[in-house]
């Protein structure tokens, strides 16, 4: 992570949230738009369900990786933000601190499972009542939370028998990789040599990676990008996705040193 092109922290992905996608669908016989039947309109049914989803927050669940993230991140911050990061590590976590951190999408993603509407599809003509309305809901599930719990929660949130919920991308659970000293130590040494003073921070990735397949094969996996990104300028999956050119070249130098270190050829 960087700020104003200056490295602030070096993250190591040791776990990732579980990717899952669901389809919410309501149907009706349709008709002409001059004779509306609001109580039967699939668009209204799905829209109301999405409003309920937008107002719901999944419970907070911290694991080894997310705890380490907030513990180390608190050392980088000052004032209220640093205090809030320490406060959520208490047992029980401070509710006011949770509310403030949850207001920031980046930190909220480290605290809980999230589900969000990403696509809508409804109707076939502007002068006809819709026969169907569909909404795609993408969820990022905490690695230690059973996906079945999330699917059941969606059913309770939707709370409408007229809406069918189907899984369109089946979740593949991905167990966290342990924070082993023999893994972190070489990374920390290389970071200290190249970016003095920049701390290494374990992170639970909110996105998805191929690491889940390796972890499910019993191979502990760690994501080491070495590409510093500004959290206020992340454009992943966008048409204008980009990284700093200098960050790219710095990363290739780091990767070369890292591969030599883990291959036993540090010099």
Each language-model region and where it sits:
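A common structural junction motif
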Residues: 53-57, 155-163
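The feature captures the short pre-catalytic strand/loop hairpin that immediately precedes
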Residues: 20-34, 231
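A short core secondary-structure module
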Residues: 29, 33-59
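Short, solvent-exposed loop/turn segments at the edges of secondary structure
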Residues: 7, 15-21, 110-112, 130-132
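Short, hydrophobic beta-strand segments
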Residues: 24-27, 135-140
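An extended, acidic, His-containing surface patch that forms the Zn2+-binding/catalytic region
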Residues: 62-127, 131-132, 143, 148-152, ...
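Short, small-residue-biased leader/transition segments that mark boundaries at the very start
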Residues: 1-3
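A generic structural motif
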Residues: 30-34, 124, 139-145
């Amino acid at each position: 992570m960087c700020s104003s092109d200056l490295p602030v922290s070096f993250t190591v992905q040791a776990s990732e949230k579980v990717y899952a996608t669901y389809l919410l669908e309501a149907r009706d016989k349709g008709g002409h738009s001059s004779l509306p039947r609001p109580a039967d309109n699939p668009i209204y049914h799905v829209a109301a369900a999405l409003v309920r989803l937008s107002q719901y927050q999944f419970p907070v669940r911290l694991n080894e990786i997310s705890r380490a993230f907030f513990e180390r991140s608190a050392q980088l911050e000052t004032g209220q933000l640093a205090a809030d990061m320490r406060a959520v590590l208490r047992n029980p976590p401070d509710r006011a601190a949770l509310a403030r951190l949850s207001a920031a999408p980046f930190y909220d993603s480290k605290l809980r499972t999230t589900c969000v509407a990403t696509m809508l599809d409804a109707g076939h003509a502007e002068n006809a009542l819709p026969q169907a309305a569909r909404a795609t809901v993408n969820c990022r599930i905490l690695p230690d939370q059973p996906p079945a719990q999330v699917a059941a929660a969606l059913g309770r949130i939707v709370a409408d028998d007229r809406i069918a919920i189907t899984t369109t991308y089946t979740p593949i659970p991905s167990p966290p990789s342990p924070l082993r000293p023999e893994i972190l130590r070489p990374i920390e040494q290389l970071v200290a040599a190249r970016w003095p003073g920049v701390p290494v921070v374990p992170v639970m990735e909110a996105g998805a990676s191929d690491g889940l397949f390796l972890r499910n094969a019993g191979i502990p996996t760690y994501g080491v990008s070495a590409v510093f990104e500004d959290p206020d300028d992340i454009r992943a999956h966008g048409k204008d996705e980009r990284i700093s050119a200098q960050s790219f070249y710095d990363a290739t130098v780091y990767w070369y040193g890292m591969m030599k270190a883990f291959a036993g050829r540090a010099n």
